[in-house]
Amino acid sequence: MSNPPAEQPAIRVTAMPADVNFYGDIFGGWPMSMMDLAASNVASRRSAGRAVTVAIDAVSFHLPVHVDDELSVYARVTSAGRSSMEIATEDWQRDRDSERTGKVTEASFTYIAIDELGKPRPVPPERTP
């Protein structure tokens, strides 16, 4: 199995019994919602303000998630336009009782930076650390 990205995850959560489907695996919408939360954090930070999801593209599911698995969600800006940003996300699970990991889900999100009236606003130039 491959390894997760080297950077810190945007969020890390534990899959709970309330998130299972009829077959006992975690419902597919749960890892997608975790990716949206992580992408939102990254988009808001990059745009220095409010940003909203306008599209989710190319969602791929690779492995099931089970109750008690730890889910690490990685997100990064891959491009920024005048008011839009593309955010690449990956979910990686780790078995609770081992260091075994696997890529669960990946997707690309499009966010728009908006102002206090909900209108598109420019994404500021990228800041250097």
Predicted regions located by residue number:
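Hot-dog-fold acyl-thioester-processing enzymes
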Residues: 1-55, 112-129
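HotDog/MaoC-like acyl-thioester-processing domains
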Residues: 2-11, 66-67, 78-129
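Alpha-helix boundary/capping and short turn/kink residues
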Residues: 25, 64-65
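Short, charge-patterned binding micro-sites
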Residues: 56-64
